[in-house]
Amino acid sequence: MTHQPKVAIVILNWNGKRYLEQFLPSVTTTSYSDHQIIIVDNNSSDDSISFLEKNYPSLRVIHLSMNYGFAKGYNEALKQVAADYYMVLNSDVEVHSDWIQPMVGLMESDTTIAACQPKVLSYANKKLFEYAGAAGGWIDKFGYPFAKGRVFDICEEDHGQYDDVSFIFWVSGAAMFIRSSVFHEVKGFDEYFFAHQEEIDLCWRIQLAGYKLSSCPQSVVYHLGGGTLPRGNTRKTYLNFRNNLIMLAKNLPWLQKWWKIPFRIFLDLVSATKGLVIGDGGYFLAIVRAHLAFIKWVFFNQHKSVFPKRKNGDLLGVYHHNLVWDHFVKGKKYFREVVKNDF
């Protein structure tokens, strides 16, 4: 490779000193020559900044005036970063020193690929795929996200079964390697999302703009997960359900959204009712609040979330069936059981 693209590894932090202490040392071992590590601080109230000043004085820190969340936090920061590629990296991710090179090689070999992700394994159990992306994200016809190596809450062991580079629907927000030009072309993350599912929405818009997303399993990272909002947190449940509906309303063709969104709301309410029956009232209320917030968005904010769209053809990484039925009724636990010959 004659040209050595510039890579900016950008880590968003909010009151995450403990994660910086634990995971930043591995990132600083990155061996790719033309890279810069940038910490974006979402107005932390802990001593993250003093820790960085004392232990990593050479790292660039971008200070934001308030906690903008994941979406706007990155949008604000990346306006100030000049690089060929952005490595959007969660603060709770451990990496190998040579993790960047395979992704640069893949992206440089195919200019139609706008973003890719490494294989994401669990930091707690490094034999397992991790929930947030695993070996590359897919989506079903009703907007349920899943991944190669993770279907709903079931994460597979990694035996190299997904080690072939392949096109996917979405790239993990825990470790997203993206062309800076494309990120700005599609207007970055939707800031209304605040956090959760914003990377899937971004990747959907990237495909609508005519680009592709890919896995890059030759690069491997280890994600702790749940650093800011642990799984099961009602705030996380609310954001996931609200943002998923907004994403469908924004990106589905008109001929599909009129029936898919009501059916998706029905499926959500089935899940909420199940939560109520087993005594999880918080889960039930979070979904109801998410639906009310979605209705509010439709009436008052939908016009603010208009992004360029150019492609109407088939999207890659879409499972054109009902994942809920296949998983919970037919008992298909793993990606290969669900998708079979479609990847």
Where are the predicted features?
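Active-site-adjacent helix/loop segment of glycosyltransferases
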Residues: 10, 209-329
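Acidic helix N-cap motif at the loop->helix transition within catalytic regions
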Residues: 21, 46-54
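Short, acidic, metal-binding catalytic loop of nucleotide-sugar glycosyltransferases
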Residues: 25-34
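Glycine-rich, basic loop-to-helix element that forms the pyrophosphate-binding segment
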Residues: 63-81, 91-93, 102
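Conserved donor NDP-sugar-binding/catalytic core segment of glycosyltransferases
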Residues: 93-144
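A recurrent flexible, glycine/aromatic-enriched loop bordering the glycosyltransferase active site
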Residues: 137, 141-147, 152-178, 200-202, ...
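A short, conserved alpha-helix in the catalytic core of glycosyltransferases
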Residues: 163-220
